[in-house]
């Protein structure tokens, strides 16, 4: 279990990366990917997963003699508090190139100061077919920004909820040198991906803490890491699905997005997606049984 957790904590820098890493782990344990838009024919003893959206995943393992309607379901969320990069984010402030950001989820704001921050998320790019844009998973894999703090004798006593993110939590990504003057942050992202900036149609990008997971304590019995909420739960569920034994149940996990902002999205826990997938699991088993008997 600890191995799965370590891999997810370091690789899961956004909800999209969490789902991609979970997908890789499940594929390594004989899970088969299903297409949400195709008909499913499922087999007793089979292992399957479906990814309705890039930040949501549902996996299920069917028992050898599954009892109709008997399911064990575990839930977790793939997102966590971050700083989200706004549209048209570049700002020049007092000779520094900065980004306009907004809080995503319940940030502990003080913890974002004076840390190396990477940029990650997804980038949507135009292709020759206007109706089929391509989505890239992006991770700068290097510290692109920092939110500097003031010395105690220079700052006001504003902490926690009183802190204004737009005024006091401003990420700096460059000095006002010639190179930075000629580029904005999307130019750097495009170069990392080997693309032209003008080909970028849209993006969903975040700043993330680049600190790595560490085992701490005299007995090495504690973990210090960013993103423990909620990757710990995601890791436990994925690890359980990898080790699940074949019985007479259908074991299901659903990893939702947007819990940090209320879950009321198409990929959130307040959607009808999971109930629809459970219905399709039952229907897929019925079709397989009819074909076997017939």
Per-segment meaning from a language model:
Residues 1-292:
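N-terminal hydrophobic/helix-forming segments and targeting peptides
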């Amino acid at each position: 279990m600890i191995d799965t957790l370590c891999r997810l904590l370091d690789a899961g820098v956004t909800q999209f990366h969490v789902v991609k890493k979970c997908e890789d782990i499940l594929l390594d344990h004989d899970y088969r990917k299903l297409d949400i838009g195709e008909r499913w024919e499922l087999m007793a003893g089979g292992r399957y997963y479906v990814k309705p959206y890039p930040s949501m995943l549902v996996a299920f393992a069917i028992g050898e003699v599954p009892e109709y309607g008997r399911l064990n379901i575990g839930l977790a969320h793939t997102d966590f508090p971050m700083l989200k990069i706004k549209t048209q984010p570049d700002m020049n402030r007092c000779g520094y190139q900065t980004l306009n950001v907004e809080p995503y989820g319940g940030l502990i704001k003080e913890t974002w100061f004076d840390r190396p921050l990477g940029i990650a998320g997804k980038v949507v790019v135009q292709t020759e077919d206007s109706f089929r844009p391509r989505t890239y998973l992006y991770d700068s894999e290097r510290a692109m920004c920092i939110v500097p703090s003031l010395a105690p004798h220079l700052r006001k006593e504003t902490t926690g909820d009183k802190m204004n993110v737009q005024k006091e939590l401003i990420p700096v990504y460059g000095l006002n040198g010639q190179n930075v003057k000629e580029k904005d942050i999307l130019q750097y992202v495009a170069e990392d991906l080997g693309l032209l900036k003008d080909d970028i149609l849209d993006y969903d990008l975040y700043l993330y803490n680049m600190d790595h997971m560490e085992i701490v304590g005299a007995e090495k019995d504690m973990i210090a890491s960013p993103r423990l909420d909620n990757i710990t739960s995601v890791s436990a569920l994925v690890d359980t699905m990898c080790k699940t034994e074949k019985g007479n149940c259908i074991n299901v996990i659903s990893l939702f997005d947007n819990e940090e902002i209320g879950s009321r999205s198409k990929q959130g826990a307040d959607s009808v997606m999971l109930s629809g997938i459970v219905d399709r699991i039952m229907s897929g088993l019925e079709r397989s049984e009819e074909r076997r008997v017939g």
